[in-house]
Amino acid sequence: MLFRSLTPFDTAAHTALTADGFYGTHYAKARTWNAVPDMITYYDLANTLTVWNVTAAGQPTEGQTTGLYDTDKLSVYDKYAMFLHGNNGLSRVQGNGSGRILVIKDSYANCFVPYLTANYADIDVVDFRNYNYGLDKLIADNGYDQILVLYNFDSFKSDPYLYRAGVQG
C-alpha cells in the first residue's frame, strides 16, 4: 500500500508536560549572549521503548525496555536527550495502532516519534551514528509497511554515516 489513512495524534486526549530552559543545537553553535530559551512540550504516554543491542549485522538482541522519555535528562544541559533516551542505534516503540514503520533519523526526529504511536503497532527507529550494519536484513526481517526518513536538512546533506544504509547486513 503506497499511502495509508493516518489519524492525527490527539493532543487533547493526553496530558501535556513542559520543561523550560531548553537551548537547542543552534544556540550550542552560536552561543549568543541574548538567547532566549525555548520550552519543550511533550505528552505523557504509556508506550514502551526497547533499546536493542546490535553487535553484528542482522543480530539485534533485546536490551532495556523503558518508557519513551528519560526525564532525568531534563535536569542537565542536553534536555533534548530525554526523548527516546538519546540517539540509540536501534530502538522499538510499541504503539497503539496497526502496522509497522521504520524511521531512519538523526536527533531531529526524536521528539516526533512519539506522535507516531497513534498509528503504528511497532515503530523501529535507526540512527546511523550508532548503527553500523545496513538496512537490508532489518527491512527483510521486519516487513515494514512504511519507511520514514526524518532528518534536519543540514544534517542530512552532510551526514558522514548515511553510507551505512547500504552496508550489507
Describe each model-derived feature in a short phrase.
Residues 1-169:
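Extracellular glycan-modifying ectodomains
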